[in-house]
Every structure is written in C-alpha cells, then in structure tokens.
C-alpha cells in the first residue's frame, strides 16, 4: 500500500545577495514530506528561483511621477538664420518666415510648477521624455496653462477610459485652460520590449482634443519603457546596455493656418503657392537645415536611436545616417522607414569619427531642409 504523504512548511531565513535585488533577509518556505526535508536538486533551485522572481518583481515595480504643463511659446525653426548644411544655398522659401506661435509640453520638478526640468538641446520641440520599467505605474500631473482645452494621450501603455486622454467619456480627454488632471498609466508586459526589440522601446504621447492641429502645435513627447532587469537601477529606468540615446521626430509641420510672429528674411512670398510651400516646415525635432544641434557621441559608444514619424500622406520618411549602420529588429541597415504614427527603436555602435549627415532620404524633403548633422568624436 502506497504511504500517505504528509506535507508541512517551515519558515527559514536566507540572506540573499543579487545585483537587481536589495540586500536583506527574506523568508523561504521549504517543503517537508513525511516529516523529512526534501532538499533535492530538482525542488530547491526551482523553489528558490520562483521566490526570487517574486522578490524581483516586488523590488522593481514602482510608480513614476511627473509634473507637466502645456504652455504657449514662440518657436524658431532656424535660430541661426542660416542653412547650416549648405551655407551657400540659403533657406530659400522656407526661410521667409521662421518664428511661429506654438504650444509645448514643459516638465517641472514638482507640483508648484515653478522650476522647469532642463532638457538636452537636441530634444528641440519635443516634450519631456518620460521613463518607466516594465511593471511600473506612471502618474502624470497635467496642468493646462494654454488658452484652449488640451490633453495627453499616450500610445502603448495601459489605461482606462478616464485616462485615455482622447475621445472617450473620461475627464482626462478635455482639460480646460487653467485646469489640472492626473493621468494614471501602466507599463505592463504588453508595453515592454518584445522578443526582437532592444532592451528599451519608445512610445509616443500627444494632445488629442483636436489631434491633427495639436500635433502641428508641437504638443508631442515620448515615453521609453525598459525591459525588466535591464534598467541601470530601480530609481534609474535608463537601460544599462547603452551609453547614449537620442530621440528624433520626423514631421512636416504645416504652419499655413498659424500666426507668424516674425518673418525671417522680411521678404514677401511671390505667390500663394510659394507661401503655402514656405509654411511647410520639413523638420527634425522642430528644426530645419541643420539647426538641430547636440547629436554628439564618442567613438565606440553604444547608441540607441528612438525614431518617431507623424503627419499626413506626405510624411513618409526614410531616416538615414551617414558613416554608420544600425540594427533594426535584427536587420542591419542605414535607413529606417517611418510612416505617420511610427515608433522605432534601433541600436548603433559609433565606430568612425566624423561630422556626419543625418536626414530624410526623400528627395524633396532633403531640398526643404529635413536634415542635420550628428558627430562622432574620438574617445576622451
């Protein structure tokens, strides 16, 4: 007759040291069968592994909190007043008006909304880059300092109707001027990098009360989600397997219905057709003809590029790096295709020093100024 197995559990203490776990004393519950401990090579590693997964999950999950305001600004597409790619060519019709009324997302340090968080110069018109680790919750306190209703709608993360920030019945879909709303999002496994992705991927957020107009307004930003176990630290969601990262938005801003603050060359347009073309700003991060600055890395740096595409049927872009190649979902290339709504994350090893071109490869987009430079300097 088969003996009856009696199982009981006994609390034991075990000191655990693991790079992505805080040190401390944790309680394990080893299994006893028929009054005898069954510490076999099959049971113990599996049990400890299960417990470590539980501890890791609890240790890494966090709530990331941000304070963001929407504000009216003046934006200059070419602050230098020059074509910095081909100086002898000038800015042509796209330089006859350069400064326009826009709106931007601005990040602040806390709920007083008094001290701005400084952004790298290369971010240009983009709103703050938010970050999360897989499993995190994200809380965004949004203050509308603009003169019209706005919102924040995020791609890729999980939310309910109240927090969609778009056309659902939720109160976050329509934040009136002077009002505030706190968005609650979740970066779960469906928001995190997939099997063919790098250790972090980019998602887009933007205003969605009048989405088309508000994208051209400049109300655009990104959130980067890092795979669990790949962050630099629990309080630093940046991926640990890269040295530098950049985000670039390829978008033709249609300024034909927007107020011009000042003209660039004080010249009248020759025709309505020329005016219409001149107000189409073929920009990378809101700058034209090489006026986007700050894309600099050191030789041998591991660089991640987060690419965003937005716009209409004319916004079919091909981002091209001179001098280097990138790895895109396992494919080696030096050109990445972007459609409106695209969000792509690619990796590069910066090997060759130089002041390289970075541009859209569509011919008339090159002519209209959708180009800049990125620099690789020798290792310091």
Feature map (PLM): residue ranges:
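Active/binding-pocket-proximal capping segment
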Residues: 311-314, 318-329, 337, 364-366, ...
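Extracellular/periplasmic metallocenter environments
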Residues: 141-151, 157-161, 165-233, 336-380
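Surface-exposed interaction/gating patches
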Residues: 243-322
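N-terminal, post-signal-peptide metal-ligating segments of extracellular/periplasmic oxidoreductases
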Residues: 60-150, 154-172, 267-303, 376-378
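Bacterial N-terminal signal peptides
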Residues: 45-55
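Solvent-exposed, conformationally flexible loop/turn segments
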Residues: 133-135, 176-180, 243, 298-301, ...
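Extracytoplasmic entry segments of secretory-pathway proteins
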Residues: 31-34, 42, 57-109, 139, ...
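N-terminal secretory signal peptides that target proteins for export/translocation
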Residues: 1-41
């Amino acid at each position: 007759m088969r003996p009856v197995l009696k199982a009981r559990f006994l609390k034991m203490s075990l000191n655990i040291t693991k790079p992505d776990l805080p040190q401390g004393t944790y309680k394990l519950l080893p299994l006893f069968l028929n009054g005898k401990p069954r510490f076999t090579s099959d049971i113990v590693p599996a049990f400890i592994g299960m417990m470590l997964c539980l501890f890791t999950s609890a240790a890494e999950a966090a709530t990331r909190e941000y304070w963001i305001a929407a504000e009216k600004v003046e934006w200059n597409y070419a602050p230098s007043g020059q074509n910095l790619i081909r100086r002898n060519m000038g800015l042509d019709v796209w330089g006859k008006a350069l400064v326009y009324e826009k709106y931007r997302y601005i990040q602040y340090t806390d709920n007083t909304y008094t001290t701005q968080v400084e952004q790298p110069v290369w971010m240009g018109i983009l709103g703050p880059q938010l970050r999360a680790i897989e499993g995190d919750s994200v809380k965004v306190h949004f203050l509308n300092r603009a003169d019209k209703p706005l919102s924040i709608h995020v791609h890729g993360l999980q939310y309910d109707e109240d927090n969609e920030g778009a056309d659902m019945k939720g109160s976050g879909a329509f934040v009136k001027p002077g009002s505030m709303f706190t968005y609650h999002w979740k970066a779960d496994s469906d928001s995190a990098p997939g099997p063919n992705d790098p250790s972090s991927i980019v998602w887009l957020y933007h205003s969605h009360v009048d989405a088309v107009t508000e994208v051209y307004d400049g109300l655009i930003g990104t959130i980067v989600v890092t795979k669990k176990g790949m962050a630099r630290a629990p309080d630093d969601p940046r991926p640990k397997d890269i040295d530098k990262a950049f985000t670039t938005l390829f978008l033709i801003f249609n300024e034909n219905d927007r107020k011009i603050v000042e003209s660039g060359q004080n010249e009248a347009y020759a025709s309505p057709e020329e005016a219409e073309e001149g107000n189409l700003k073929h920009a990378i991060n809101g700058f034209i003809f090489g006026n986007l600055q700050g894309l600099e890395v050191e030789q041998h740096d591991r660089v991640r590029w987060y690419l965003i595409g937005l716009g209409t049927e004319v916004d079919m872009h091909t981002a091209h790096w001179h001098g280097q190649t990138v790895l895109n979902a396992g494919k080696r290339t030096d050109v990445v295709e972007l459609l409106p709504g695209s969000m792509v994350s690619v990796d590069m090893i910066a090997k060759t020093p130089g002041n390289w071109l970075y541009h859209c490869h569509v011919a008339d987009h090159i002519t209209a100024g959708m180009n800049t430079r990125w620099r690789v300097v020798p290792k310091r």
